[in-house]
């Protein structure tokens, strides 16, 4: 429960999307324990502020389907392997959260009894209300859908206030800022602008889903100091995507 000395929250329930690649840290593969522990501490701070936190993790640090696809492995098989990679990341994060005495539940779109709970919308909402972190794993459970789309879907289902996409850059740019020094960083974008400009925020399925349901997105640099705390208290960090420019 938030006490009177804590700042007023703009977002009470969030869905945080964290890429698998971000979990690698400076490595080329796997999970950097220091990144995992840092993420767990950031989440703990939000929970202690009274924020309800759901998460979706990517799996790109453990599995990339492109190489296997080029070798002849089918797309559906590759996508299923990617879903399992997200489960491995979810298990690692749950362990990191529990090491700092923060209760966490994993809910998987693919049943894996005895390891994680199956996804159940009403139970997920109950866990969130009880102060537990809920990690949604295995994407949507269907091939051809990205973890970005899964994040937006789960956010809508649980009634989150916003989807927060943590990246390695400080927002959305008109072009790759590493390749184009004239690239412009946007503070605000509409869903339509993202789609018409072909900006790499999320895949078009995820953007259209958010547009249809009025779910705002915020893209930010996870390495920015106190980024999550600043966002949930209403500070403009990174790029906000919504129906208009005054979300």
Curated annotation (Swiss-Prot):
Inhibited by UTP. The keyword NADP does not apply. UMP binds at residues 59, 79, 140-147. SUPFAM superfamilies: Carbamate kinase-like (SSF53633). GO terms for molecular function: ATP binding; UMP kinase activity. ATP binds at residues 17-20, 60, 64, 167, 173, 176. GO terms for biological process: 'de novo' CTP biosynthetic process; UDP biosynthetic process. Pathway: Pyrimidine metabolism; CTP biosynthesis via de novo pathway; UDP from UMP (UMPK route): step 1/1. Keywords: ATP-binding, Cytoplasm, Kinase, Nucleotide-binding, Pyrimidine biosynthesis, Transferase. Catalyzes the reversible phosphorylation of UMP to UDP. PANTHER family: URIDYLATE KINASE, URIDYLATE KINASE PUMPKIN, CHLOROPLASTIC. Homohexamer. Belongs to the UMP kinase family. This is Uridylate kinase. It comes from Legionella pneumophila (strain Paris). The gene is pyrH.
């Amino acid at each position: 429960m938030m006490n009177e000395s804590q700042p007023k929250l703009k977002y009470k329930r969030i869905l945080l999307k964290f890429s698998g690649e971000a979990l690698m840290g400076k490595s080329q593969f796997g999970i950097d324990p220091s990144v995992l522990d840092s993420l767990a501490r950031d989440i703990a701070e939000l929970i202690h502020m009274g924020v309800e936190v759901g998460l979706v993790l990517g799996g790109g640090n453990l599995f990339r389907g492109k190489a296997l696809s080029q070798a002849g492995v089918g797309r559906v098989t590759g996508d299923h392997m990617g879903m399992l990679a997200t489960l491995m990341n979810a298990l690692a994060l749950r362990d990191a959260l529990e090491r700092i005495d923060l209760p966490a539940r994993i809910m998987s779109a693919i049943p894996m009894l005895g390891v994680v709970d199956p996804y159940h919308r009403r139970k997920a909402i109950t866990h969130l209300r009880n102060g537990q972190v809920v990690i949604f794993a295995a994407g949507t459970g269907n091939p051809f859908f990205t973890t970005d789309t899964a994040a937006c879907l789960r956010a809508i289902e649980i009634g989150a206030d916003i989807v927060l996409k943590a990246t390695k850059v400080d927002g959305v740019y008109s072009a790759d800022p590493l390749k184009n020094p004239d690239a412009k960083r946007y503070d605000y974008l509409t869903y339509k602008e993202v789609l018409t400009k072909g900006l790499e925020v999320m895949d078009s399925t995820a953007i259209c889903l958010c547009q249809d349901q009025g779910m705002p997105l915020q893209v930010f640099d996870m390495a920015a100091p106190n980024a999550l705390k600043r966002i949930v208290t209403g500070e403009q960090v990174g790029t906000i995507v919504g129906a208009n420019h005054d979300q």
